[in-house]
Amino acid sequence: MRKILIVIDMQKDFVSGILGNAETKAIVPKVCEKIRNWDEDCILYTLDAHEEPFYSTTEEGKRVPLHCVYCEDGYYLEDDIQAALMDYEDARDDQEKAGRFDSVVKETFGAVDELPYMIEKCMPEHPFQIHMVGVCTDICVISNALVLRSAFPKVEIYVDASCCAGTTPENHKAALAVMKANCINIINEE
């Protein structure tokens, strides 16, 4: 069965910047390893993107500091993640296998239209599995997992808990429990 890997918001502001924490930094090597070892045809990664003055008028903007400002440093992928994606592409080229990665830019927690569309582009034939990693477990990972659960009711979805981090360890665990309750498979949970 074919599989697609979705890497959620592994951007500088979420990992080592304004919204980062010890847990988000700690998962970077695991996420890089997962990307480099991905032996399937497609990886998608989301990019949270905000701009003023619009952001400050949103509910998120009223509660969360401005982050991932489009085309500023914090918007871009963490350097190690970007390098892992390039290694994935190079390895696929060396093996003469198809392999690609692409971005999905989103302005809110869940990429409601964009992510299902891009998955269908990458995986036009069913059945397939969706595998997810990234940050923040309790915000964008869960939001996108639930979007995909609704968009693809017959597809198995897996979230690798060891490659996710939340705003707090408690929120991470709570989000995993909610995803389990919504028929999302949680793997590598400690």
Region locations from a protein language model:
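Gly/Ala-rich phosphate-binding loop of Rossmann-like dinucleotide-binding domains
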Residues: 149
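Conserved N-terminal glycine/acidic-rich loop preference
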Residues: 103-143, 165-190
